[in-house]
Structure formats: C-alpha cells, structure tokens
C-alpha cells in the first residue's frame, strides 16, 4: 500500500511539472487567473460575501445556483445588499446561471446574525416537491442551515421570492447535511444539547417538508448522552446512496483523527433508536480510521468502478471506491498537509487506502501565498457527465483541481484554475511575535458541477463565484466534445 501511495503522489508531481505550472507567489489585483485545461465562463461577486456551499438545480427551463455563506467578518459583520440598500447578515445567494456567461443575481436571503461560523447559512440542499413522496408538487424546497442553531426549509419555486416553510430549531453547530429527494430522508448535521460532541447526526423524515418527523439521533459510541471516557471525533458530514444502495458514508474529523464510517441505511432508519452504545454500533458495517494528522471532511462514494488494469483478472474487475477529502484549517501551512485519499471498500469490512493526491507546494509556493493551503472538499454531484471519471477538489489558495480518477489507484491531475484576486478579496492573517501578519490570497472553498458539465467554485475570502469549463485534452476524460 505504501508503494502505491508514494507512486500516486510522485505521479502528481511529475504531471504538474509540465505546461501551465503555477509559479507565482503573492497574488496581485489585475493579474490574470492561473489556469491549465480550464477556462473562466462567468462570474458573480456574490455581494462580496464569504461563500461556503454551492448547489446547482435544474429548475424548469432555468438553472439556479443556491450558495450558502459563512457569517460576516469583524470588519464587515453584515455587508450591504445593493438590491435593498440595507446591511444584511450573510445568508443564501440565489443566482440564475442559465446562461453561465451572464449570471444574474436574483436574491440574497439573510441568515443568522453573527460572524464567521457563528452566523450565516452555510449549507444548502434542494429537492423538487414532485420528487418528494408527499411534497407539494408545485414547490421547490431549499433546506439550509441557519447560523449554528437551526435547519430551515424554504419554498423557492420562485427563486427570487423564497417563502419560509418550517424551521427545526433548538440546536447548536448545525453544518453540512444530506437530503434524499426520492425518499425525503435527511441526515442533518447538528449539535444536540445533551450529546457529548459538537456535531452528530439527526435523522429526519422530510418527505413532507412542512411537517418534519424526527427518526433518531446517531453518532459514534462514546458521543451519546450519559457515556463516559474519551469522546470520539465529531462528525463533519454524510453522503447516502439511498434505498437502492442501502449505505450511508459518514466522515468524522475535519483536519485530524479522521474516520470513514460505513453504515447500513436500513438498520440505521429502522433499528432501535435509543442512543445506547450497542444501538449506535448496530448499523455500522465498518470503519476506516485515519491518521491523527488527517480528517474526513467529505466521503464521496463511487461504487462499481470498472478498473481497466484489472479487466483480464478473474475477480475484482470492478471496485467500490470512496474518496475521502480532508480540510485544511490553519493559514500558511501551520498544520499537517490536508489531502485527498482513495479507499477501496470492495470488501466492506476490510476497507483499505489505495492512493492519495495533493498539490505539490513548490508548484506555486503556496505556503507563502497567504491563507489556507490544502484540500477542503469535492464536488458531490453524481451526474453522469463526470461521475466515476473526473472529480474536482477545492484547494484554497491553490484553487480548484481536476483529477482523472478512472483508475483510482493512480489519480492524475489534468487541470486547475486559481481565480484572480479582486479588491473584495479579504486578508488572512497569522500571528508573528504576537502581531498579525496578513496576506491576501484566493481561498477556493467549495466546488460543484452541473449536468451540463460546468464547474462552480466559490471563495471563502469574499471573491465570489467563478463558473468554469474544462478545455483541451481534459475534456476527453469526461467524454465532452
């Protein structure tokens, strides 16, 4: 295994030594973006709000981007909305991207007052009412977090005029969730007041969004109320394969002590619900425990992948793969490198790491650029245009990276895009001898794709939304013309 890991890393280094290498250190306003096999299609400044999660939804004959935001900063706790002329706490941006070259900003929906992680409305998921078992067929539902204290559901059938449907309140540290549109089951990342961890899972039936029904609380044994001893690392987020796949992949830890937990969905939903250690263990199939150096921010399943190298083998021609993405937390490399990992879970109770990927720091002097450098998240769309062929990883000051993962044992970078900074790009600071030393750099925070083959990246440092497309030989990896 160690040989494969080293090979994957060294292959990435060799690839990046080719054309288009990013070699500049400090970004300056007016300089062009740095790009290889990607090009800019369109932008929106998102009212200079710190952005977290983009979700792209095909809504009738339109394509709408719903973008969650972090809370405001010390300097600007509530930016002015040019559409209303009022200062509004960061919330949700709603942007029409039907023409990706000319995004139209439709609405800012304010979130919770508060700065950074204490405010905003970071997470967004969308389900059509006609897809949900008992939803209003004319509705389009947006599930979002509200600061750290609640989850909200809005009707965004008219995306410029959202209507609040309901709120699940009385929580803390709400964060990244997953919503199955065909069943209505939602895995809500929350902090329940009596649990021993900052974040765990609350499973809800949101098939009728106007009447949420709680199913159960879930987490790792030792996190539940009344338990003793060391508390296992907190949840970051789940991804479910729904009833057909009958699996939920939970990622615990963000930049340290990561755990991939593979869970039987049916047992999770229908097993005993009291949060005892035995009941929490019951639906678990396996865990993959990572190094103390690395977390599990995103756990993206790619099941039944045909491996060309194994095509003539009697067994194991296809493999079940989960991509695990860590999150860099600290500025200017003041932590272990946060990376991308690929796990083979074909033998579910014996998952194993098979490869990894990182951006070579020397390719852009990224530790000196300012802000965070390292992985954060991947696209989560399972649309066929890219699924099991190419993934996109946000890498903070190294922009977004495109990986050819058709052979997940040897992931290969095939493109990147680092946006140019603007006058809105916020500084990032570190303490040197007790004083702030600040630099301005892109902080590509999250990435998503749509069925048309466009990429959407958003910036944590207030630089807005960039809509991209693949160019050159990288398009062939996805089968794009």
Predicted features, each with a name:
Residues 1-5:
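N-terminal secretory signal peptides that target proteins for export/translocation
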């Amino acid at each position: 295994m160690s040989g494969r890991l080293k090979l994957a890393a060294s292959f990435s280094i060799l690839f990046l030594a080719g054309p288009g290498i990013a070699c500049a250190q400090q970004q300056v306003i007016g300089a062009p973006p740095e790009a290889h096999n990607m090009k800019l299609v369109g932008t929106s400044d998102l009212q200079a709000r710190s952005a977290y999660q983009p979700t792209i939804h095909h809504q009738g004959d339109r394509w709408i981007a719903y973008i969650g935001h972090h809370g405001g900063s010390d300097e600007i706790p509530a930016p002015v909305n040019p559409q209303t002329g009022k200062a509004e706490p960061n919330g949700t941006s709603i942007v029409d991207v039907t023409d990706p070259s000319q995004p139209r900003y439709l609405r800012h929906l304010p979130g919770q007052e508060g700065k950074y992680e204490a405010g905003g409305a970071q997470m967004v998921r969308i389900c059509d009412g006609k897809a949900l078992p008992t939803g209003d067929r004319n509705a389009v539902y947006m599930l979002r977090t509200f600061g750290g204290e609640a989850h909200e559901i809005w009707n965004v059938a008219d995306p410029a005029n959202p209507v609040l449907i309901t709120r699940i309140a009385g929580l803390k540290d709400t964060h990244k969730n997953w919503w199955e549109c065909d069943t209505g089951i939602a895995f809500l990342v929350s902090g329940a007041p009596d649990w021993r961890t900052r974040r765990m899972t609350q499973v809800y039936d949101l098939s009728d969004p106007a009447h949420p029904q709680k199913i159960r609380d879930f987490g790792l044994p030792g996190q539940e109320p009344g338990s003793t001893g060391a508390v296992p690392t907190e949840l970051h987020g789940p991804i479910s394969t729904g009833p057909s796949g009958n699996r939920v992949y939970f990622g615990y830890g963000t930049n340290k002590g990561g755990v991939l937990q593979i869970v039987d969905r049916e047992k999770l939903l229908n097993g005993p619900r009291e949060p005892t250690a035995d009941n929490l263990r019951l639906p678990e199939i396996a865990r993959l425990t990572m190094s103390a150096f690395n977390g599990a921010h995103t756990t993206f399943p790619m099941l039944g992948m045909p491996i060309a190298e194994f095509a003539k083998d009697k067994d194991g021609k296809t493999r079940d793969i989960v991509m695990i993405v860590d999150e860099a937390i600290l500025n200017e490399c003041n932590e272990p490198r946060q990376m991308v990992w690929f796990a083979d879970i074909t033998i579910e109770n014996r998952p194993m790491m098979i490869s990894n990927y990182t951006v070579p720091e020397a390719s852009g002097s990224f530790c000196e650029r300012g802000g965070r450098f390292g992985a954060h998240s991947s696209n989560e769309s399972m649309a066929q245009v890219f699924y099991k062929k190419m993934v996109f990883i946000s890498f903070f000051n190294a922009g977004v990276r495109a990986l050819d993962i058709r052979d997940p044992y040897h992931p290969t970078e095939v493109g990147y895009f680092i946006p140019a900074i603007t006058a809105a790009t916020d500084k990032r600071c570190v303490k040197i001898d007790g004083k702030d030393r600040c630099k301005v750099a892109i902080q590509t925070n999250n990435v998503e794709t749509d069925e048309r083959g466009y990429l959407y990246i958003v910036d944590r440092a207030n630089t807005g939304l960039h809509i991209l497309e693949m160019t050159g030989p990288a398009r062939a990896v996805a089968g794009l013309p």
